[in-house]
Amino acid sequence: MNKLSCGRKSRVEGGQLAGDEWTRHGSFVNKPTRGWLHPDDKVMGPGVPYLVRYMGCVEVLQSMRALDFNTRTQVTREAISLVCDAVPGAKGAMRRRKTCGRSLNSILGKSNLKFAGMPITLTVSTSSLNLMASDCKQIIANHHMQSISFASGGDPDTAEYVAYVAKDPVNQRACHILECPEGLAQDVISTIGQAFELRFKQYLKNPPKLVTPHDRMAGFDGSAWDEEEEELPDHAYYNDFPGKEPPIGGVVDMRLRDGAAPAVLRQSPNHMGATLPVGQVSGAEQDSRKMQPTLQGRERFPVPCSRPPNRPDLFDDPSYVNVQNLEKSRQPLRAANGQRDIFDMKPFDDALPSAQAIVSMEDQLKREPWYQGKMSRKEAERLLKVNGDFLVRESTTTPGQYVLTGLQCGQPKHLLLVDPEGVVRTKDHRFESVSHLISYHMDNHLPIISAGSELCLQQPVERRQ
């Protein structure tokens, strides 16, 4: 393996390490031989603050998982270049990058320079990357670590910049750019690496119950999902019953009622990466010390949040099956020690402007290649060829209802994704969006349990242009 040096890249892909400054220990990695820069309890608690400049963000149109490492690096560099060219006073003395082998036009979208050039306090913890304006203390963003996919910093060509990809309701998936004082970018990216490692160690000691398929089945005699029934002429709808009304506009974005959606993070070329699940909230202190290599996390959200208890049963439409066991399983997951599961992430509602945070589910889904729009059951089934094929469509009988259609053991299955209040959920967990739900099960290779059978999401059926 190559030694980690200023001009070389060291990375972690899917938990596999590169660079012999890092070693493998059990199911995760040891810290670098020189040690981390900060005490573990500080990173796990209030977090480590850095004074940097927020330079804006550039929309990323494709999942980082679909790109190879070199392309991810090129995307990061190009995003930094675009922002530096657009923001007056940016440290633009970067050496011109070599052109990427593939065009980035289809990967990078529009820029958002709303807070460009603003001095901020970046607080790095095992919970999140918190971006707060230094003068007015306004929180620009709070990107939860479990939504981080890739981070990059201290590259020779972009030595004073840190870039990471995150997903939020305002910018969707975007590459956020931070300008650091001289020599600080390496420290920032190293601290992010430390936070990921600590978070992963917490994860190993106290894994969320949801990731164990056996536990998901234990004591379960119904379905974790509501299945779509056949489209019959006498189909019963919610407004067939006194006091029952369909959701206004199809669905209500419940994420914004309980909090904002999580974010996605990206990694740096010269440093280390680690694919780690994370989640929780942090405070802010003042201090700045130095750091080390980069790390890579999972772009999509690894762990969904639990559904609040005592919410009335929403799936009471007689056309849906296996709904009798919904209520009793909605209690938040608890860790083995009796404490609340640290991966039961609590949505944040103060990280982004509420007025701008409203993004319709339809607009979000149109960005996903596996979303087909309005489509009947039979049309959807004709598109499924092999086991593991899946797509998401809007129901032709219930506007605003989205259905996951997949093929398992040669049999098509149709699963409802959204309850009448617009919440995307399973029997005992809710997700920030349909995209969150799909990527969670794909990234973690977890089957969806329904009526005692499993549905695995392996090959997305992309819509025809």
UniProtKB/Swiss-Prot annotation:
CDD domains: PTB_Shc (cd01209), SH2_SHC (cd09925). Residues 44-227 form the PID domain. SMART domains: PTB, SH2. Residues 370-461 form the SH2 domain. Gene3D superfamilies: Pleckstrin-homology domain (PH domain)/Phosphotyrosine-binding domain (PTB), SH2 domain. GO terms for biological process: cell surface receptor protein tyrosine kinase signaling pathway; intracellular signal transduction. Pfam families: PID (PF00640), SH2 (PF00017). It is found in: Cytoplasm. Residues 228-369 are annotated as: CH1. Highly expressed in oocytes and embryo. Also expressed in liver. Detected in ovary, testis and heart and to a lesser extent in liver (at protein level). This is SHC-transforming protein 1. It comes from Xenopus laevis.
